Amino acid sequence: MKKKYILAIDQGTTSSRAILFDHKGRIIGMAQREFTQIFPQPGWVEHNPRDIMTSVYTTITELLNNTQIDVRAIAGIGITNQRETTVIWDRQTGQPIYNAIVWQSRQTKDICDQLTTAGYQDMVHAKTGLLIDAYFSGTKVKWILDHVENAHTQAARGELAFGTIDTWIIWNLTGGQVHVTDYSNASRTLLYDIHALRWDPDLLTMLDIPAAILPDVRSSSEIYGLTQTPYFHGEQIPIAGIAGDQQAALFGQACFEPGMAKNTYGTGCFMLMHTGKKAVESQNGLLTTIAWGLNGEIEYALEGSIFIAGSVVQWLRDGLRMFGKASDSQAYADRVSDNGGVYVVPAFVGLGAPYWRSDVRGAVFGLTRSTTKEHFVRAALESMAYQTRDVLSAMQADADIELKELRTDGAAITNDFMAQFQSDILAVPVLRSQIAETTALGAAYLAGLATGFWSSREEMTQHWAINRCFKPQMDKEQREHLYAGWKQAVEATLGFRVA
């Protein structure tokens, strides 16, 4: 039967999606299912790994039922996932020994503090391109092994398996036959040397993690195994693409050349700049990461992670009850000509790149008696654009590359006010992708390359299309005046301490 489709499984922090793409990269069908978030203690975030798989299976079933396609027409499956989230399971039974510890969770902060105090920061940064932070997988693995009875003994005997969510999904889809990850996900674990391309023995020793639990690291586009599950009506479909969600979005945005960058505006903001075959070491608070491994070559990226972006709109809606729907925020922002001197620094869980200060908290500056709800909403939206400029400035300094345009996706950038202000404050065109699901599209592209569904990146570039281009309209003096106010607000926030 002719292969007409690629299936992408997009496993995110709050939901899983199954999306079917055709040869032109168009969405044929989509299904989504949320799952339960677990908060055992303040600052801890966990998932039940079985709930994750149930959500994946449910979306696959719903998608196939809704589209009524012949499963045999699916050329391959691409998987993209919430990065860093950690699962450890029993190889024999396939049962997790503890909940998945989510990337957002801060429950390993004490371990990170101990490692930093012990002087490991420079070694970790040199090998991994990352910082010692509870964000990454390595300390989560250590925490589980330390807190589950007999886990260290079982791990040393090779009875346990570790994986990020891509690994967990593939293990289950292949009936426990395949234990793999790709370069992009491995590079986020704090255990992988992104230069030597290996699980690093010094890092494993530092965290007391046996190598026996680790998955094989493979390229981001190859056939890893075949499905062994009834959800595809007995058909064995190649699983052929893997990438962490932000790297997948970079690929889906067709950012294939050094200097090209994308920004995803979700709960947080994740900006990646392609740096080619060179791993650029950041001197300005960014992360160096593997973008993907393809055709025997590794390509790298610089990444800036912003913890609070679109969720500032949720805060305005749910916490402060300033409007009923998130989409209303644009109308409020448009009712005033400027921010009235108000700056919102949304450091609700600290500040990410390029500051990396988990101890600071959110603040508002510039309030006067004439400040209105509209000024407040506008200032909150503007905070996303200012934080993006913080990251871009660091990227351009590190990579010595001047950005020509910024490709964007995510719910928050569908706000036209936000998109225009972002272009104004960066002084570069902001291109909003026609397809919002660029993360899933990137995973589909990787699987399609491995199965021959697509022939080349050039073919994919032809499919990429703009929903709208926003060009800078603000003069330099005003732009720099506004940004100077933001920098002043951030400095004041960094200096404030809760008694």
UniProtKB/Swiss-Prot annotation:
The record's annotation in Pfam families points to: FGGY_C (PF02782), FGGY_N (PF00370)
- One Gene Ontology term from the biological process aspect of the record: glycerol-3-phosphate metabolic process
Q: Which GO terms describe its molecular function?
A: ATP binding; glycerol kinase activity
Q: In which pathway does it act?
A: Polyol metabolism; glycerol degradation via glycerol kinase pathway; sn-glycerol 3-phosphate from glycerol: step 1/1
Annotated ATP binding sites:
T13, T14, S15, T267, G310, Q314, A411
What does the activity regulation annotation say?
Answer: Inhibited by fructose 1,6-bisphosphate (FBP).
SUPFAM superfamilies with a match to the protein in the record: Actin-like ATPase domain (SSF53067)
Q: Which UniProt keywords apply?
A: ATP-binding, Glycerol metabolism, Kinase, Nucleotide-binding, Transferase
Per UniProt, glycerol binds at R83, E84, Y135, D245, Q246
- Quote the record's binding site residues for ADP: T13, R17, T267, G310, A411, N415
**CDD domains, alphabetically?**
FGGY_EcGK_like (cd07786)
Task: Give the protein's biological function.
Answer: Key enzyme in the regulation of glycerol uptake and metabolism. Catalyzes the phosphorylation of glycerol to yield sn-glycerol 3-phosphate.
Write down what this protein is called: Glycerol kinase
